[in-house]
């Protein structure tokens, strides 16, 4: 390839790395590096016009309305006492297993993540409740924190999931309903894998089981948590039944969560104002990131980056499974230093064409990509959930790494199963996704 074609690529990624290194927020790093790359091919006025146009077009999508609505619904759920009720339900369901509180943490994170759609919120809300309980029962603080950190991202695989909506946008319109359905089985499988690790660890360290509860107590706990659980069935049931679109489902989630907060009487006017402000800030950051990433996507396409990466990977091997392994390794590496949303926006346009050329379904590849990048949320140096979990558990990161290792092994096994057994992701969309 001639230097004149490589030059825009060098400028794009070189300036991106330099701008990030000096501490500029990733959103502006993406936008500026894209502009610098486009300036090589176009005059300044035209380059600015193109980048602004691509940002605007990238945000001009009805599906994107779901992001601020789901963010708001999640924030209402976080403050509305939902986590405590789900923890009580999880304890009632798995309390008799060895290491019951660890299993409770995993199950509560799975349920809460499925309702709030936020891994960070799950780690903070559930961890804030479970860490003191586990410490009181003699659990190692490092182990309890590791369990919370490893299980918090499960909610990103199960609807409502903003990262799956972002992937739908970055992939050119993959069905959000199909992606939502595709995440269920991998999410449940991840929870079971982590519970297996927790059971082995608990058996080895002789952790206690919870006291047995009677049917009346269980029904009381279940009744208390049922209104929260209904949100999951309302959202996915309405989408599958064709009653409403994923975007409309997000608005319904806000109305339902507000009604639930009013019933529970956990949110006052002051808290609601803070929730709205936080939701506006979070949504603005995400949507600005989406817009800038659309500009970078165009800059990469203009510089033939996807074709270059395709040639490099296929030159190593033409075997479908080997190429998929290479993509997985790259995504695992990317996840260690880049947050999940920008990683999806930047690397989906690069890797999805390769995956489609190999005959991999875009829905399946989306689940592979999201699962891969969620592991990065638990690893240094940029592991958001790792930092949140350690802050909640009041423990240093270096002490959590050792108990995290067997959990990472379990996650890698699940990742291999998701990659090489496509039906784990595609079974439910095939059966239930609306046409």
Curated annotation (Swiss-Prot):
Q: Name the family.
A: Belongs to the YiaN/YgiK family.
Question: What is the protein name given in its UniProt record?
Answer: Uncharacterized protein YgiK
Corresponding gene? ygiK
* Transmembrane regions: 9-29, 57-77, 110-130, 146-166, 176-196, 226-246, 280-300, 321-341, 343-363, 367-387, 408-428
Q: Any idea which GO molecular function terms this record carries?
A: transmembrane transporter activity
Annotated membrane topology: Multi-pass membrane protein
The listed locations are: Cell inner membrane
Keywords, comma-separated and alphabetical: Cell inner membrane, Cell membrane, Membrane, Transmembrane, Transmembrane helix
Major localisation:
membrane
Q: Disulfide bonds, which pairs?
A: none
Check the record and name the Pfam families matching this protein. Answer: DctM
Q: Which terms in the GO cellular component ontology are assigned?
A: plasma membrane
